[in-house]
A protein has these predicted regions:
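Outer-membrane beta-barrel channel domains
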Residues: 1-178
Length: 178
């Protein structure tokens, strides 16, 4: 389900990885003791994906998925007695990614935008990011200028960027920076 069309969401600055949806639960660690049992995967309660293209060439894609809360079993010692209990190892989580690209200048040049969000129920932790990108093919597609810039939207801001300029025909060269 998540593999088909996944390349539309991929880029050098990888903001979204669909393999995290349904992965082995590991969000919470017990405050004491040792994990002795936990599920191998997180249950996906619902998921939807829409991929398409308009007649004007705008490509779009949206993925939204909700995963269940999962519990693990821990073993700990209390007053010299070995005990076991369950603890929340993974809360309900909502994963979202949306992206679109629009052709400009010619059919091989595009600008794009992407937004991601991960929200975990009962947690004051959100992971959101946005990204803008472009691919410009100029001079009969011999000169290529690409770039992207991303930032997080939460308490701990992070930024990333990448620029690349390349030329091909008759010889090839490129300059890139991250």
């Amino acid at each position: 389900f998540f593999v088909q069309g996944a390349s539309f969401f991929n880029s050098w600055l990888r903001l979204f990885n669909s393999r995290r949806i349904g992965r082995r639960p590991n969000f919470n660690e017990p405050s004491s003791g040792e994990i002795v049992d936990q599920p191998n995967e997180t249950t996906i309660l619902s998921a939807a994906k829409v991929l398409g293209q308009t007649t004007s060439g705008i490509k779009y894609g949206i993925i939204n998925a909700v995963t269940s809360q999962e519990y693990g079993t821990r073993e700990f010692e209390l007053n010299g007695v070995s005990k076991k209990d369950q603890f929340l190892i993974e809360p309900y989580s909502n994963y979202f990614v949306g992206r679109f690209t629009k052709p400009i200048i010619n059919e091989l040049s595009t600008v794009g935008f992407m937004a991601t969000d991960l929200h975990r129920s009962g947690q004051n932790i959100k992971a959101s990011s946005i990204k803008g990108d472009w691919l410009l093919n100029l001079m009969d597609n011999r000169l290529e200028f690409t770039g992207e810039y991303a930032t997080t939207i939460n308490e701990e801001n992070g930024y990333a960027g990448r620029l690349r300029l390349g030329y091909r025909d008759p010889s090839f060269w490129e300059i890139a920076t991250w």
